[in-house]
UniProtKB/Swiss-Prot annotation:
Chlorophyll a B3 binds at residues 662, 670. Phylloquinone binds at residue 671. The gene is psaB. It is an enzyme of class 1 (oxidoreductase). This is Photosystem I P700 chlorophyll a apoprotein A2. PANTHER family: OUTER MEMBRANE PROTEIN, OMPA-RELATED, PHOTOSYSTEM I P700 CHLOROPHYLL A APOPROTEIN A1-RELATED.
Length: 734
């Protein structure tokens, strides 16, 4: 018999039903569950696949550069970044005739194009690229890296080049390599690029390979470095009248601590960023020399963790046993990596708009909105993934004997207290926040807006004041004009910071009031509830009072049959599934808040947000309905416009989202009956019955249907909001 899909599971390959296909797809990447897998092959497969992942990333980024160089308008955008719309790529086949062609021919293009809202133009401009040739060179270089990655992946699957398990478990060498080799050296290299290429470009000097060795990035060269006069590199920075990309108002400093923003580009000073990357490089290069490898000096991770036993005895045996637990569990390591990456991605979202690093990106409002929303959604998915793999760790890899009375075991011992506290916090936040919103809503409805309960966020305002915001009138720390910190800040460090905090043209420490107080607590409710579901899923993954033997059923089981009541919907997978809905819900509130606050800021009518955000109808009417009006315009006698594609995507997103409920609310029996009826009809229909199938069609399992429903719900939700966000922002600001 020929080998059938899936080859990695003979049990599944022999399944006579369509379950074979779905279960095969579902377990294709669960290497641990494959036939004849060994620990060594598991590690080697994952290692090789990382190179494939890198190849895809390099190919994708190469494609961005290539298409902009080929079909974009980078060179004309560089001449006038604030008024030329950046083109992502051409549209080959604009449907709906001449009106469509006219609607999408923009940005000085000859034919229909897509506008770029990703910020790549601003990024490339900031780092010193100026011509299409530069973009092509970058695309070719990334294509080369992609090919190298593919070759490396293939190579590490060959017998002679397969690393051993001991190599993968050498934690100290990996730490040193990642800290020094990846973070340290790459940060140092980036500092080099900024100093040698980007900063000269911002001052009108074009540095390329042909003159790299001739142009001194600083008039005194390396002299100050070797003589210890490092402060010379900070002297004579660009002036506040500097025109970016020209020598007008330019200085000679390369490593500064100016603080605040370049007045023209509204982005951080390039010389500050070079300084930042140099500091990061130094820290990581040192960190990457701290762990004991071949030379018998430095820290041993195992010794470090075993020594972490709090003397008071409150944490039992502390971190004893954790080294082997983490080092032998890929799921634990992945959980830690995802948790870190999730936090970082959300921090990127928060910092990209408040401290914009790229020239002129702060004035490209649609790009700002798109990047914030994009990074928050990515962060949400990564964070839920961290808990999912944490739960799989508890089911597949956790050993009670190895972790006796350490912090991990004590987490499990105290899980009732942890879960009930999260539950209490969620209930408190939910009822109080909803109570305030509903009360205010009713007061507005009955025509007595003065009876709203409006709470001023005084603690948050105090924190903003401590960082230098003076408008609230708190005389504290950096907002205290006669304090030592304030005076030092004027001269010694970051003199531009206090100006930036108190300017109204940027997004640093936006002025906040009762509407912010309420939505902050709504978001806190979402975060705590999502966390509650995820933490409960992981801590109850091995078992609970209701189902003590849960770990024997694996990560995702629907129920333990009809004989055990209450065992449905309590697998660790179900917790992940439910948490994703809450995660999407929470990020919805986060992005609504960010977008509405910024639209009113950019339009100069902040009072709209301040007055309408304190009650539910305000959010529904003045944010959602008002901003979606262009998208629900429908057919009109004026034909197409450049927002039509977003209007279509808005509709289509709703369709995909609603389709999710078909999978989420109806279950197997209904579909099984329908499938059997359709199969009967198929077999009796001329021509159609020439096509036969070997697998008996069966309905999706409960868990699979949930996954398909969740996927449609998520994709539709994000499509809908993306269309709304981009259309409502670009429709207002062009």
């Amino acid at each position: 018999m020929a080998l059938r899909f899936p080859r990695f599971s003979q049990g599944l390959a022999q399944d006579p039903t369509t379950r074979r296909i779905w279960f095969g797809i579902a377990t294709a990447h669960d290497f641990e569950s494959h036939d004849d897998i060994t620990e060594e092959r598991l590690y080697q497969n994952i290692f090789a696949s990382h190179f494939g992942q890198l190849a895809i990333i390099f190919l994708w980024t190469s494609g961005n550069l290539f298409h902009v160089a080929w079909q974009g308008n980078f060179e004309s955008w560089v001449q006038d970044p604030l008024h030329v719309r950046p083109i992502a790529h051409a549209i080959w086949d604009p449907h709906f005739g001449q009106p469509a062609v006219e609607a999408f021919t923009r940005g000085g293009a000859l034919g229909p194009v897509n506008i770029a809202y990703s910020g790549v133009y601003q990024w490339w401009y900031t780092i010193g690229l100026r011509t299409n040739e530069d973009l092509y060179t970058g695309a070719l270089f990334l294509l080369f890296l992609s090919a190298i990655s593919l070759i490396a992946g293939w190579l590490h699957l060959q017998p002679k080049w397969k690393p051993s398990v001991s190599w993968f478990k050498n934690a100290e060498s990996r730490l040193n390599h990642h800290l020094s080799g990846l973070f340290g050296v790459s940060s140092l290299a980036w500092t080099g690029h900024l100093v040698h290429v980007a900063i000269p470009a911002s001052r009108g000097e074009y540095v390329r390979w042909n003159n790299l060795l001739d142009v001194l990035p600083h008039p005194q060269g390396l002299g100050p470095l070797f003589t210890g006069q490092w402060n010379l590199y900070a002297q004579n920075p660009d002036s506040s009248s500097h025109l970016f990309g020209t020598s007008q108002g330019a200085g000679t400093a390369i490593l500064t601590l100016l603080g605040g923003f370049h007045p023209q580009t509204q982005s951080l000073w390039l010389t500050d960023m070079a300084h930042h990357h140099l500091a990061i490089a130094f820290i990581f290069l040192v960190a990457g020399h701290m762990y004991r490898t071949n030379f018998g000096i430095g820290h041993s991770m195992k010794d470090l963790l075993d020594a972490h036993i709090p003397p008071g005895g409150r944490l039992g045996r502390g971190h004893k046993g954790l080294y082997d637990t983490i080092n032998n569990s890929l799921h634990f390591q992945l959980g830690l990596a995802l948790a870190s990456l999730g936090v970082i991605t959300s921090l990127v979202a928060q910092h990209m708009y408040s401290l914009p690093a790229y020239a002129f990106i702060a004035q490209d409002f649609t790009t700002q909105a798109a990047l914030y929303t994009h990074h928050q959604y990515i962060a949400g998915f990564i964070m839920t993934g961290a808990f999912a793999h944490g739960a799989i760790f508890f089911i597949r890899d956790y050993s009670p004997e190895q972790n006796e009375d350490n912090v991990l075991a004590r987490m499990l011992d105290h899980k009732e207290a942890i879960i009930s506290h999260l539950s209490w916090a969620s209930l408190f936040l939910g009822f109080h926040t909803l109570g305030l919103y509903v009360h205010n809503d009713v007061m507005l409805a009955f025509g007595t807006p003065e009876k709203q309960i409006l709470i001023e966020p005084i603690f948050a305002q105090w924190i903003q004041s401590a960082h230098g915001k003076t408008s609230y009138g708190f005389d504290v720390l950096l907002s205290s004009t006669n304090g030592p910190a304030f005076n030092a800040g004027r001269s010694i460090w970051l003199p531009g910071w206090l100006n930036a905090v108190n300017e109204t043209s940027n997004s640093l420490f936006l002025t906040i009031g009762p509407g912010d107080f309420l939505v902050h607590h709504a978001i806190a409710l979402g975060l705590h509830t999502t966390t509650l579901i995820l933490v409960k899923g992981a801590l109850d993954a091995r078992g609970s009072k209701l189902m003590p033997d849960k770990k024997d059923f694996g990560y995702s089981f629907p129920c333990d049959g009809p004989g055990r009541g209450g065992t449905c919907d309590i697998s660790a997978w179900d917790a992940f599934y439910l948490a994703v809905f809450w995660m999407l819900n929470t990020i919805g509130w986060v992005t609504f808040y960010w977008h509405w606050k910024h639209i009113t800021l950019w339009q100069g009518n902040v009072s709209q947000f301040n007055e309408s955000s304190t009650y539910l109808m305000g959010w529904l009417r003045d944010y959602l309905w008002l901003n979606s009006s262009q998208l629900i315009n429908g057919y009109n006698p004026f034909g197409m416009n450049s927002l039509s594609v977003w209007a279509w995507m808005f509709l289509f997103g709703h369709l995909v989202w609603a389709t999710g409920f078909m999978f989420l609310i109806s279950w197997r029996g209904y579909w099984q009956e329908l499938i059997e009826t359709l199969a009967w009809a198929h077999e009796r229909t001329p021509l159609a019955n020439l096509i036969r199938w070997r697998d008996k069609p069966v309905a999706l399992s409960i868990v699979q249907a949930r996954l398909v429903g969740l996927a449609h719900f998520s994709v539709g939700y994000i499509f809908t909001y993306a269309a709304f966000l981009i259309a409502s922002t670009s429709g207002k600001f062009g």
